[in-house]
Amino acid sequence: MKAKPALVLAAIISLLLVRSIEAQDLGPQIKKFKDGIYVYVGKELNSNCGIVLTQEGVILIDSGHNPTDSRAILAAVKKLTSLPIRFLIDTEPHPDHTTGHFVFSPPAVVIAHEGATESMKNRERESPDRIQKLAAVSPEMRAALEGYRFVAPQIEYRQKTTLNMGERTFELMYLKGVHSEADTAIWLPKERVLFSASAAVVNQYNILRPIVTIPDILAALKMMKGLNPEFVMPGHGTPGTVKIFEDTERYYGLLIDRVGKMEREGKSLDEIKKELRMPEYDSWASKDRIPSNIEAAYKVVKSK
């Protein structure tokens, strides 16, 4: 894809603007990975958003945890560049990653894995008053929701696809059975930056729904580690390195070992849920999700 002269000129001007404002405050939640690659880190382990500048426009990874985040992300983008947001790539279809789509699309074209649209529409049908409840959270949230409309992906891919935008290449990869019905990892091979979806989260228990299996999670982590990324942005939690994956692998390995030991002692699943302790992870948030983790580990043990 060749850039048009007008876009090249706009890109040069935009880069000069970036250099002049990078010393300014983009907000405490904006962190810089590399030149032109930023992350909006969600508050209190909320979902993250990636901001990638190219010569032909901006690509976002998810749209923020809620519309107040989306508005803050848009404000940061406008400080960084005058170029439009061309694409928004979903790492998953859940509302805490997608409600803010309306802030960016149009003009942004939303891309997700096959099945994301159906998942999003199902949740809208199941929770018809969701937006009304969200607006009641605070006056700021109500203001951020002004103009809300449901925005589903305009493009769905299957298994793998590549998006070339300006000087950057984005490789989209489906992650089977790790979190939702349609999880996507986004890999920038030249920059060695990976947006790893919610296959692994930081300092909190992940919810393991019936569609999720620990072997699928471990397979996805192994694949992503094999890319040898320099920077990793998880779906939730502080961005970092492959240590995020290693910590997650260690946790699931320990969980399976302990569940297996208790199962061999003759304990039922309900007994294991009541008695199992993981003191190494007492500092992790979302402890209400532990039962779903134990159930997933129990399935692994019983399948051996």
Q: What is each PLM-predicted segment?
A:
Residues Q24, G226-N228, P239-K304:
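Accessory terminal helices/loops
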Residues G36, V52, D62, V77, ...:
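Divalent metal-coordination and catalytic microenvironments
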Residues V8-V18:
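Bacterial N-terminal signal peptides
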Residues R19-A23:
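Sec/Tat signal peptide C-region and signal peptidase I cleavage site
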Residues I30, Q55-G57, P67-A112, E156:
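Active-site metal-binding motif and surrounding structural segment of the metallo-beta-lactamase
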Residues K31-A76, T184-S198:
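Conserved beta-strand hairpin/beta-sheet module of binuclear metal-dependent hydrolase folds
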Residues D25-G27, K32-F33, G57-I59, S63-P67, E118-L254, ...:
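Metallo-beta-lactamase
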